[in-house]
């Protein structure tokens, strides 16, 4: 089998940030997949699964209701390795194009109060796997340490 593109990225050099993972053309439409790297691979503990699940619910709800990007959201969810999230947008974008959106998202998550959207047995297949407090902590950390002063090293994959 051929190695997939995401396995060709040197994860020993990968920093936390916002990266274009891939761009695909499906018919006449372009789809951009973003790698929202919240944890430094293999150097930092992965996201707790309950925190990641909570951020997925908050994030997907926020993004699909966003006034500018809501109709462009295809998918938002955690990576299997739990070091970040994938965001798929309809359109052709660069990392710098979505910095403000990702800042809004993680600020919203860090400040979130109330019931987690979709956190019921009717709405979710594993609704008890939630940790709002830890999700807020992780969102605040990513915002403060990465998004607030993001630079080119955090927007382009390492060579």
From Swiss-Prot:
Gene3D superfamilies per UniProt: S-ribosylhomocysteinase (LuxS) (3.30.1360.80)
Molecular function as annotated in GO: iron ion binding; S-ribosylhomocysteine lyase activity
Domain of life: Bacteria
Enzyme class: lyase
Keywords tagged on the record: Autoinducer synthesis, Iron, Lyase, Metal-binding, Quorum sensing
Reported function: Involved in the synthesis of autoinducer 2 (AI-2) which is secreted by bacteria and is used to communicate both the cell density and the metabolic potential of the environment. The regulation of gene expression in response to changes in cell density is called quorum sensing. Catalyzes the transformation of S-ribosylhomocysteine (RHC) to homocysteine (HC) and 4,5-dihydroxy-2,3-pentadione (DPD).
Record-given protein name: S-ribosylhomocysteine lyase
């Amino acid at each position: 089998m051929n190695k997939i593109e995401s396995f060709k990225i040197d994860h020993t050099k990968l920093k936390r940030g916002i990266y274009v993972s891939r761009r695909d053309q499906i018919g006449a439409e372009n789809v951009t997949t973003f790698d929202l790297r919240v944890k430094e691979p293999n150097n930092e503990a992965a996201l707790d699964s309950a925190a990641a699940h909570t951020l997925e619910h908050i994030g997907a709800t926020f993004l699909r209701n966003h006034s500018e990007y809501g109709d462009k959201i295809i998918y938002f969810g955690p990576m299997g390795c739990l070091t970040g999230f994938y965001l798929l947008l309809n359109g052709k974008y660069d990392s710098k194009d979505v910095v403000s959106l990702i800042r809004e998202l993680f600020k919203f998550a860090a400040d979130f109060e109330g019931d987690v959207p979709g956190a019921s047995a009717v709405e979710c297949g594993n609704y008890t796997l939630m940790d709002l407090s830890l999700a807020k902590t992780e969102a605040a950390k990513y915002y403060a340490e990465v998004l607030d002063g993001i630079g080119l090293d955090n927007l382009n994959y390492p060579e």
